[in-house]
Amino acid sequence: MTKTDIATRVHNHTWKLDPIVRSLIDTDFYKLLMLQMIWKLYPEVDATFSLINRTKTVRLAEEIDEMELREQLDHARTLRLSKKENIWLAGNTFYGRSQIFEPEFLSWLSSYQLPEYELFKRDGQYELNFHGRWMDTTLWEIPALSIINELRSRSAMRSLGYFTLDVLYARAKAKMWEKVERLRELPGLRISDFGTRRRHSFLWQRWCVEALKEGIGPAFTGTSNVLLAMDSDLEAVGTNAHELPMVVAALAQTNEELAAAPYQVLKDWNRLYGGNLLIVLPDAFGTAAFLRNAPEWVADWTGFRPDSAPPIEGGEKIIEWWRKMGRDPRTKMLIFSDGLDVDAIVDTYRHFEGRVRMSFGWGTNLTNDFAGCAPKTIASLKPISIVCKVSDANGRPAVKLSDNPQKATGDPAEVERYLKFFGEEDHKEQKVLV
């Protein structure tokens, strides 16, 4: 892969448009896995995705130029799956399985175009929504977030001279390499890049991925970014996300269907995928509620991804549940991925070492950690907590509760209804930084 002098590239902005999203597969692998399931099982369902800035003190509409945002969103809509990308998706082996994507699905994807968007300003923030069929709107999530984040980074650095930029990136590289050296101390570590959605930039994410590939070798198990996986000859990693139970729950007509929604999603997933892709994401409506009502067969799945509880606390609860179900945790997998940095990775690894199989998904603090790197303080280089979530399905409001009430999304009245239905056991307020 060609190496890029990032500081020079950032400084020399003389072209009309420097695309942030370069490919339809500049996205997370699990978006394609979920898309195939949606395309196959839920083709007539409508779903709206909406941008949510949880860092309210940052007024995005005052930091990002609307015309630049529209240009980047419009460019993303011109992208199509290339012949090379189609061949790679069709012929590559993912999670030990060949032809994981059906030919009919790839044929449909080859003519896919991101649908139109709705954008306006309100109280210093951008309101950005994507309306349409679920299988059309779902792929907007990752490019929308990466566009917002990189435009914010570009705005922060626009006034910086070449040498200031050179120092900024030199310090960021040194900071990143210090993390690599700490990770080398963990024997048997398995860690992958989950940093696409809130990355500083595409070029910086690519540098971080290449640094991990060289720096920790086999301990680096891949990247969630499909384009980088293809270009860097890495494993594409990822399983499923909250949007699946959120939509299925929103479609529920009865309390029985609402209660069954998280498990219906797993049944659907199991129809298409198996093995190491059988990873449970339990916290959409609270992990305690999920475990309390989970059928016996859920314990036979490969593992869990505890996403919003503190990692050690969340992992212990799942291990306790496995034991209660008569399963040996040492044969199971825990994937930790919520707001991790090196300290949390090291602490969690050492806590669970020898008790359970582990893997780590390293996101924002891998691909967007520039704290203390600029010669002067630049607040806009600090990452924010921004998401793009399903807001409704077939006109019905969609809700995510999470184990952390700070991460709850949805219409307040519906959030309250879900809390009464699923309960608030083990919900714990934690400050959301990324």
Curated annotation (Swiss-Prot):
SUPFAM superfamilies: Nicotinate/Quinolinate PRTase C-terminal domain-like, Nicotinate/Quinolinate PRTase N-terminal domain-like
Catalytic activity annotation: nicotinate + 5-phospho-alpha-D-ribose 1-diphosphate + ATP + H2O = nicotinate beta-D-ribonucleotide + ADP + phosphate + diphosphate
Ligase recorded as keyword: yes
Record GO biological process: NAD biosynthetic process via the salvage pathway
Superkingdom to which the source organism belongs: Bacteria
UniProt GO MF annotations: nicotinate phosphoribosyltransferase activity
Protein name: Nicotinate phosphoribosyltransferase
